[in-house]
Amino acid sequence: NNSLNFLGKVNKGLFIDGSEDKVIKLKSIITLLYPFKNINVVKKFIDKDNLNSIINDRFHNDDEIDFFSIDVDGNDYYLFENLKVRPKVICIEYNFWYGPDVKCSVPYDKNFTWEIGSTYSGASLNSLCELAKRKGYYLIALESHCVNAFFIRSDLKNNFEIIDNIKYFRTPKYY
């Protein structure tokens, strides 16, 4: 999970996961490695209708979120579309199986569950980049496993190289 990489760099954070096992493990990691940080871990299934209220319950309106990761193996596009806060950086999982040119996402289904091994999930990188531009974000990086895209808020874009999603699109080397 990309978010774990940022635990050492932030003092305040929120992790939301629907898996009891993952929540227990994450709480143990935070307690062991980062006991003095204000990191909340919430066990809850998120959807496009409850995402903002979960965030608002834990952050004040004037709190600026530095990093926000969306990785739900399905409804990522719709969560991003409905996200009201404006973090500096957003990391979103995309489905490389759709290729570089296609703009698509699985239809919204509050109860969507990704089946391990299935290529049917999430959204194409192209569709997420289009949505990001509408929301005032720009693509700055694709991680090496070809499943996470990093977007920077428009007021910070001059500090980064904006990349072209089609030019930089890759598929993982293990496929």
For the regions a protein language model found, what residue spans apply to each?
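SAM cofactor-binding core of SAM-dependent methyltransferases
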Residues: N1-I70, F96-G99
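Rossmann-like AdoMet/SAM-dependent catalytic core
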Residues: N2-N5, K9, I54-N56, D101-Y175
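Class I S-adenosyl-L-methionine-dependent methyltransferase catalytic core
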Residues: D21-I30, V85-R86, Y98-P100, C104-K110, ...
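Short acidic catalytic loops
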Residues: F68-D73, I90
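Short, catalytically relevant binding-site loops at active-site mouths
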Residues: G74-D76, F96-G99, V147
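A short, conserved alpha-helix within the catalytic core of class I
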Residues: G74-V85
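Conserved beta-strand signature within the Rossmann-like core of class I S-adenosyl-L-methionine
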Residues: P87-N95
